[in-house]
Amino acid sequence: LKVEKASAAVIDATIIQTAGSKQRQAIEVDEEGQVSGQTTPSKDSDARWTKKNGLYRLGYKQHTRTDEEGYIEKLHITPANTHECNHLSPLLEGIAEGTTVYADKGYDSTENRQHLKEHRLLDGIMRKAHRNRPLTEAQTKRNRYLSKTRYVVEQSFGTLHRKFRYARAAY
């Protein structure tokens, strides 16, 4: 039972594999590192390939917003090959002004920080280092501080995968 409004929103994404057969065709990777979605040996035509931990997976990406206690408030499902930074705004709909939004480095972009500022939300997005521009010591400390709050969304994913067999989509 949830009684009061949340003062924080924690956002992250997880991969949901489809119940498809193993890869039968070569996977093509473009110059940006995106996996081509054209090779889909599954009945599920909306699922796409992505690479995680060195393994290719066919499926979807679930973007999730939880409150500071880990209760899931909003979901947004996309094909697995989409990048996280493009899918922050649908998760922020209906959030109260002044709420702190915590998110991992995948959501770090100028557009997302601007969106938070326009909607009067507090920025808790971890900073990402770019080529030839490593993080400063202050940014590294900030990321370490923010990661201590973000664990609740990882616990929610763990519960979904472990208790409810959320690892594979079936239809």
Map each language-model feature to its residues.
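Helix-centered, glycine/charged polyanion-binding patches within enzymatic domains
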Residues: 99-100, 105-171
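Polybasic low-complexity intrinsically disordered regions
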Residues: 1-119, 128
